[in-house]
């Protein structure tokens, strides 16, 4: 999709590019924290309340060009009405001349996927606790006619209290929906988590397909690996369609029986959510979700976002903050311990996006990045102070691609952001471990960080 108008603009004068902020309505947009094929997600601040939110930026022309307006309006309207403790909340919808903005709850505890990467696998009780919350969310959305169709650990977020939040519910609007036979016909979703009937592309029930994905997630949480996996896509499809599940020895007998009922290749005999709620293994320590009585929700903003009238369009204003404010923000943010950042991330804490600081010039930084990418098998495209890195070999989920950008945060100090824009997250972890070792000499360390490093 085209670069969001909220994106930082061009190169600044002098040493390098300066980070710019953009106002969209009452929201001040920050850095990109996620990127997909049809949208970007940016962190944002509500200037009235000071609250931190996430804003999904969609290309308005893409929506209009593909005649998706009514589908998306229906799906977004449904999502705005959904208020569940385990589903990321949609607060508001706005539009400019070229973009649609979905204002979402900001979930700051990271992905459940990172917990698996760092721990290897979860204990049965902990995995069950997360599975309880996942089923609560899926059941609630299904009851309102909304299916996810791309459930995977990367779409399961954790808040600061460790509660599960499912993201991207309702985005099935971006693909063709139900046909005359009442079945869905679009094979979306990550291959390893997709149900056999979805791969067959003969139409499928959205509820049964989501249940299958939930079963794969539960297996991964408890085993630390996928039940069906192969680098060859056709072999992977065959494994999924046969659905011969081999559970590791540490699974309890109850867990084994339960997972096999979920990973039934026949959607007609596969366990339903109603039956899941009655299963003995599932019911252990289960607590039904508690709901607060929400206020009436207006859908006027959804209609206005798709209205071509000028009066309904939100204004976009670019502003440039002082460098010291940007530097202070970086220094004080959790996880941005400047000099120690690389060391921490090399110990396995790197996620789908990360950053580091350097006292080198932007030209030196970009030259060093390009130099490091060659031996790792990555092609590089440069534009101003942005770079697109793309692997020359296909991985489990296609080609690994990484976006990088250099910002000036203070005189003679620059921040480099890297984020995965395509491919497998585990492959990104492996790439980053090799990549970071090549860039050690350009990473800035404060005097106190350097002393601490010597002591270690």
From Swiss-Prot:
Which InterPro entries does its entry note? Kinase-like_dom_sf, NAF/FISL_domain, NAF_dom, Prot_kinase_dom, Protein_kinase_ATP_BS, Ser/Thr_kinase_AS
Q: Its catalytic activity? A: L-seryl-[protein] + ATP = O-phospho-L-seryl-[protein] + ADP + H(+); L-threonyl-[protein] + ATP = O-phospho-L-threonyl-[protein] + ADP + H(+)
Note down the stretches annotated as region Activation loop: 168-197
So where's the catalytic machinery, residue-wise?
150
Q: Where does ATP bind?
A: 33-41, 56
Where the record annotates domain NAF, the positions are: 318-343
Query: Which co-factors does it depend on?
Result: Mn(2+)
Q: Which residues form the Protein kinase domain?
A: 27-282
Q: Which cysteines are joined by disulfide bonds?
A: none
Give EC number(s), comma-separated: 2.7.11.1
Q: Does the keyword Heme apply?
A: no
At the top level, the lineage of the source is Eukaryota
Q: Which residues form a coiled coil?
A: none
Under CDD domains, the record lists: CIPK_C, STKc_SnRK3
Record region (PPI): 351-380
Q: Which SMART domains match?
A: S_TKc
Q: Which UniProt keywords apply?
A: ATP-binding, Kinase, Manganese, Nucleotide-binding, Serine/threonine-protein kinase, Transferase
Induction conditions? By drought and salt stresses.
GO MF assignments: ATP binding; protein serine kinase activity; protein serine/threonine kinase activity
Question: What is this protein's function?
Answer: CIPK serine-threonine protein kinases interact with CBL proteins. Binding of a CBL protein to the regulatory NAF domain of CIPK protein lead to the activation of the kinase in a calcium-dependent manner.
Domains (record comment): The activation loop within the kinase domain is the target of phosphorylation/activation by upstream protein kinases. The PPI motif mediates the interaction with the ABI (abscisic acid-insensitive) phosphatases.
Which family does this protein fall into?
Belongs to the protein kinase superfamily. CAMK Ser/Thr protein kinase family. SNF1 subfamily.
Identify this protein by name. CBL-interacting protein kinase 9
Q: Which organism is it from?
A: Oryza sativa subsp. japonica (Rice)
